[in-house]
Amino acid sequence: MMRKLAAVTAAVTVLCMPVLRVSADVPEVSAKAFVLLDAQSGQVVCGDHAEEKRPMASTTKIMTVLLTLESGELDRPFTVDSEAIRTEGSSMGLQEGDTVTKRALCAGMLLPSGNDAANAAAVAVAGEQSAFLDMMNRRAAELGMTHTCFASPSGLDAEGHGASAHDMALLARAALRNDDFAEICKKQQMRVCFGNPPYLRTLTNTNKLLAMDDTVIGVKTGFTDAAGRCLVSAAERDGRRLICVTLSDRNDWADHEALYDYGFASAQPYPMPLPELPAVPVEGEDADSVQVYLKAPPVLTAWRGVPPAYEMTVLLPPFLTAPVRKGEPVGTLLVTNGRTVIAELPLCANVEIIQNDQEPIPQNMILRIIHAFFNVFFNYR
């Protein structure tokens, strides 16, 4: 089976890989490290020291919130752990004996950046903070965050705790795919219920970009003496989404605005050159073959000064069985950037083949086998 699959799937046209650089057009920023990332493809638009591990303060809470949201039972009330909420720094106002929900804790982390909320969430999800840190680091590895170590659920300074700007952009990209996360982090204010007994309170977001620019959709601020001002944000304009990360940046609000103006202005359509599409044999006494075609060629996004890094892979079964209808999807053109799938486009039959005497094998079953095989190599998160 492995040999068959290898024989009928054609990996084609690996294009230029991106070069991480700061060109003359990129705005000057105050950050010690920054990156601007295309959320669709994962491609770096620009950056500097983007792979350098640095403390990232409360932007850490992006991971804490994501894992909390994924743990389920978000609206079940429980009493906060009294030890966990005894912490320094910013707070959502939790007190011993308070009843809260995981959803309220997530709002408390993303808006007022509550360290008490982060610690309480870690214990609620994993039973103890050390177990939760293991979860954070496992998920970081899954996301390809190769320059990251989580040693604190809140982002308070801890030995070894840090991440690169690029890693934090990858994390934000994954988190924004969670609908609950995306809904909370874009709010300038939220009403949440907690306390002893619970009552409604208003939480205010520390992310001033949300008020400065209505195209900004999140994500998280951070500050400690060691980390300086840290900011992870995302913005959407004209159907495109960019993620910006600055670490140790005294002028972060203005720098993010300038980088977004640059990034969105440098976007341009990239009509991707198609690979040669083979014919697929049709099984039966009267052997024949079907040529495949793509109904609509992909038009992707390229960024000025950054070579495209897209790859295309043709996924086709070793044979087809009649009947084959003209225009019927019989394969897939897989568009990827590294291990990230950008698009799955149907490859269709260009002719009609009538049924022969043999019992047909469903085409979609063959395609499912091929897709399962390729799932091993590509990240569909």
Provide a role label for each language-model segment.
Residues M145-T146, D157-R381:
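Domain-terminus/edge residues, biased toward the C-terminal soluble/receptor-binding domains
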Residues A6, V29-S30, E52-K53, I85, ...:
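Generic detector of short alpha-helix boundary/capping microenvironments
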Residues V19-D179:
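Active-site-adjacent loops and short helices of periplasmic peptidoglycan-processing enzymes
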Residues M2-S23:
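Sec-dependent N-terminal signal peptides of Gram-positive bacterial secreted proteins and lipoproteins
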